[in-house]
Each structure stands twice: as structure tokens, then as C-alpha cells.
């Protein structure tokens, strides 16, 4: 066996969303903040992202994280988030996967019934509250970065779909959110093949600087016709909460993924980010470890950084 660039990783999923976590084989990188370290990865180590997320080591829904020493002394660990198209400053499912990895592998001491600590994401410090029982992290609640709506009900032109009404919100990265009903679709597993073209529209999103697209469908309403639960097209959940001002402070909101798995969100304070009225949410969910792996590159491999084929990409 001839393997170079060997890394050690924990494979997990958070409510169905894959979130691989590299725990060994990567030394610290230059940068005074975790954001600067993320930019260093982007400029100098992007082959790692390609290698871990493309076939044969990854697939389109895969995510990967790298645990690094924190730059802020208040944090127990730092981490870099690598997604299919970019490096995300913040991600809900990846945060839950990283917190679960640190505790369940013993990298951080688990204290039952609750372990509290800080993580340093590229977007800033993230407070973690992990509920633990019998060596298992049963629920992770984290306090996210301030989130805000940039646009509500704007019209965009999408190839093969025409004029589409969307919202644009920031929750650690920009999300373009649209109602599945305008496409005549329901957010169910059997609609997946029809939904995917509606969710992609990459050229228009990238032209406007918006990275992720989500199709949403309201599931349950309260007496004032506000959504209490939302379903969206994603294997798991993330930090991409709804944004039209329909949720008050300290009210639970259940965000359901395509698999029926649920994260619980809550707005805990109001703030401002530049010209935008913003809120600070907490998000709760669970991750499960599925494997522990070593990945490397054979020097004779014709695809050292992986590959993409049009059948599923």
C-alpha cells in the first residue's frame, strides 16, 4: 500500500445530512483568526476539499470539516467547514457534527448530563450546550451568529423556470429560499427528481452572490396562521431558518428535513447587522457517528482530487 496525504476522519450524519470531520493528519495553518485560516485553506489547500467531497470519497450531499486549534482562548477548538462549492463561515449541521465528534471520541471531556463549551467557526464564536447520556451526545444546542433577511419576495429569472419569487437570508452564509408551491411541487422524497432542477439554478444565484438554495413547504400553522413547522428539500437540517418576521422571540420552531428528521430553532434576542434588523437563534439537533476512516492518495491514482460525473452531479 502506498498512500500519501493521509488523514483520519470521523463520519457522521446530523438528521441525515453527512458531516465528515477530519481529526488528524492536518497541521495548523497560518491565520490570526479562524476566518483567515479558512481563506488560507481556500487559497492553498483546496485539493483537500475536492478530494474529500468528490467521488470516490464523497458524493453531492457530502460535507467535511477540519478541526484546528482555536485562535480565541475562549474556544475549546476551531473548525473549518468545507462544502461542495465553497467554504462556509458557519453551518448548523456541521457544527453539531463537530461538537458530537469532539465529545464522543474523547477529544473533549464529556460531562453528563450537560457539557458546555465554545467552538470557533470562521464566522465567530459559537456556544455549545450538549446533552449527554451513557457516553452519547443526545442533543446539541448552539447559539448561532446573528441572522437577517436581505430580500423578501424578490423576483429572479431562472433558466427553464422563468420568474421565481424568493427570499434571501443570512444565517452563517447566504440562502435563497423559495416556496415549493410556486413550482407545483411538494417537498417529499418522491418529488426529488423534479425538485432538484428548481433548487439548483446556479448561474443566477452566483451572479447575485447567493450560495445556497432551499425549497420550503409550510407543514403546520398556529391560530394566527404562522408556521410552526417547515419542511424543506435537504437530507438533514441546517441553520437556514425562515425569515418573513412570522416568529417571535422564545418560540420554538420545528424545521423538518425531507427524511422527516427535525431540528428545533428558537430566536433568543434581537440585534442589528449593519443596516439590517437581525435575530440571534439557537438551533438544536442530533448527530450520529457512522464510521471512523483513514483517507489518502495513491501516487499512481489518475484522480488524486476525485471526480464528478453528470449522472448525479
Language model features by range: what are they?
Residues 1-167, 176-313:
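A glycine-rich beta-to-alpha transition motif near the start of alpha/beta enzyme domains, typified by
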Residues 172:
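Glycine-rich ThDP/TPP pyrophosphate-binding loop and its adjacent helix/strand module
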Amino acid at each position: 500500500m502506498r498512500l500519501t496525504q493521509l488523514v483520519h476522519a470521523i463520519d457522521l450524519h446530523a438528521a441525515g445530512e453527512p458531516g465528515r470531520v477530519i481529526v488528524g493528519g492536518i497541521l495548523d495553518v497560518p491565520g490570526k483568526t479562524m476566518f483567515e485560516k479558512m481563506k488560507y485553506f481556500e487559497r492553498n489547500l483546496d485539493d483537500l476539499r475536492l478530494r474529500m467531497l468528490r467521488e470516490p470519497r464523497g458524493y453531492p450531499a457530502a460535507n467535511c470539516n477540519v478541526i484546528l486549534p482555536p485562535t480565541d482562548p475562549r474556544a475549546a477548538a476551531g473548525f473549518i467547514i468545507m462544502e461542495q462549492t465553497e467554504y462556509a463561515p458557519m453551518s448548523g449541521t456541521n457544527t453539531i457534527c463537530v461538537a458530537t465528534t469532539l465529545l464522543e471520541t474523547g477529544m473533549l471531556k464529556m460531562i453528563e448530563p450537560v457539557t458546555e463549551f465554545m467552538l470557533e467557526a470562521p464566522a465567530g464564536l459559537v456556544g455549545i450546550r450538549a446533552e449527554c447520556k451513557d457516553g452519547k451526545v443526545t442533543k446539541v444546542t448552539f447559539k448561532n451568529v446573528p441572522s437577517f433577511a436581505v430580500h423578501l419576495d424578490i423576483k429572479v429569472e431562472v433558466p427553464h423556470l422563468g420568474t421565481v419569487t424568493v427570499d434571501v437570508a443570512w444565517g452563517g452564509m447566504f440562502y435563497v429560499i423559495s416556496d415549493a408551491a410556486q413550482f407545483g411541487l411538494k417537498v417529499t422524497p418522491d418529488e426529488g427528481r423534479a425538485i432538484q432542477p428548481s433548487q439548483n439554478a446556479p448561474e443566477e444565484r452566483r451572479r447575485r452572490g447567493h450560495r445556497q438554495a432551499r425549497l420550503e413547504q409550510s407543514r403546520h400553522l398556529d391560530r394566527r396562521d404562522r408556521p410552526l413547522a417547515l419542511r424543506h428539500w435537504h437530507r438533514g437540517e441546517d441553520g437556514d431558518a425562515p425569515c418573513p418576521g412570522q416568529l417571535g422571540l422564545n418560540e420554538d420552531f420545528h424545521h423538518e428535513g425531507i427524511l422527516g428528521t427535525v431540528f428545533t430553532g428558537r430566536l433568543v434576542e434581537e440585534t442589528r447587522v449593519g443596516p439590517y434588523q437581525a435575530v440571534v437563534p439557537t438551533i438544536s439537533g442530533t448527530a450520529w457517528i457512522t464510521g471512523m476512516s483513514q483517507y489518502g492518495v495513491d501516487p499512481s491514482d489518475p484522480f488524486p482530487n476525485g471526480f464528478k460525473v453528470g449522472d448525479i452531479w
